[in-house]
Amino acid sequence: MKIGIIGAIEQEIRKIKEIINNLKIKKIGNIKIYTGTFKKIEIFLILSGIGKVSASMSTTISINLFQPDFIINSGSAGSLNACLKIGDIIIPKKTCYYDVDLTNFGYSKGQIPEYPQTFKTNKNLREILKEIAVEFKFKFLTGLLVTGDSFIRKSNCIKKIKNQFSSAIGVDMESTAIGQVCHNFKIPFIIIKSISDLSDNNATSHFEKNIPIASLKSSKLVKLLLKKISSQNSI
């Protein structure tokens, strides 16, 4: 089995690198690719860089070079739900752009032409993750994760997003782009995000303080997922 894992920044992949055997590194442009194994699984861990374009490039490279059975996007997110606190986990059912608007042409808010409005994560992987999260007592929510090329750090931005996507529980800068590429190439994907900040006026300082916590939590869940999959050798 071959699994691609994508994280935007070094903190989000550092702990994952530690569990990969025979670790090797290569670069394509500014994108770092770590290859190796975890038990019987071939791992392709990509440091994508921040934002939708970087995430899209990294996902396309992963699929074209390595043909993974599925892709994991691991890292941090801002909370849009009062129940989600620092270190809590989001296991999204689906993801959507909050900064795309072609509604004047009859498309739904967030929808790219020729694509669905939302991109759904793989149900089997999602259910496995939920079982693991319950077993190991992670606090988590499932729902809609929204993506855009801005770090949300103001309460009025939260209000605007929630007015347009009332069911959104979190916000990030990469996941929907990864979902769109996976949809295009028919590759299953799953998202594991841990809350680093509350997307409010204190978001910048909270992110800087809490990114180690969020990265540790999301990486731990990735490791547990890999263990589970390696033991059953299927999804």
Swiss-Prot record:
Catalysed conversion reaction = S-adenosyl-L-homocysteine + H2O = S-(5-deoxy-D-ribos-5-yl)-L-homocysteine + adenine; S-methyl-5'-thioadenosine + H2O = 5-(methylsulfanyl)-D-ribose + adenine; 5'-deoxyadenosine + H2O = 5-deoxy-D-ribose + adenine
Q: Which UniProt keywords apply?
A: Amino-acid biosynthesis, Hydrolase, Methionine biosynthesis
One MF term in the entry's GO annotations = adenosylhomocysteine nucleosidase activity
A GO biological process held by the record: L-methionine salvage from methylthioadenosine
Q: Which residues form the active site?
A: E12, D197
Give the EC number(s) listed in the UniProt record. Answer: 3.2.2.9
Name the CDD domains on file.
Answer: MTAN
**Per the database entry, which stretches of residues form a coiled coil?**
none
A GO cellular component annotated for this chain's UniProt record is: cytosol
Q: Which Gene3D superfamilies match?
A: Nucleoside phosphorylase domain
Which Pfam family, any one of them, does this sequence belong to? PNP_UDP_1
**According to the lineage, what is the superkingdom?**
Bacteria
Enzyme type, top EC level: hydrolase
The entry's substrate-binding residues are: G78, I152, M173, E174
What InterPro entries is this protein classified in? Answer: MTA_SAH_Nsdase, Nucleoside_phosphorylase_d, Nucleoside_phosphorylase_sf
Q: In which pathway does it act?
A: Amino-acid biosynthesis; L-methionine biosynthesis via salvage pathway; S-methyl-5-thio-alpha-D-ribose 1-phosphate from S-methyl-5'-thioadenosine (hydrolase route): step 1/2
Family per similarity comment: Belongs to the PNP/UDP phosphorylase family. MtnN subfamily.
Physiological role: Catalyzes the irreversible cleavage of the glycosidic bond in both 5'-methylthioadenosine (MTA) and S-adenosylhomocysteine (SAH/AdoHcy) to adenine and the corresponding thioribose, 5'-methylthioribose and S-ribosylhomocysteine, respectively. Also cleaves 5'-deoxyadenosine, a toxic by-product of radical S-adenosylmethionine (SAM) enzymes, into 5-deoxyribose and adenine. Thus, is required for in vivo function of the radical SAM enzymes biotin synthase and lipoic acid synthase, that are inhibited by 5'-deoxyadenosine accumulation.
How is the subunit organization of this protein annotated in UniProt?
Homodimer.
Protein name per Swiss-Prot or TrEMBL: 5'-methylthioadenosine/S-adenosylhomocysteine nucleosidase
Which organism's genome codes for this protein?
Buchnera aphidicola subsp. Schizaphis graminum (strain Sg)
Species lineage:
Bacteria, Pseudomonadati, Pseudomonadota, Gammaproteobacteria, Enterobacterales
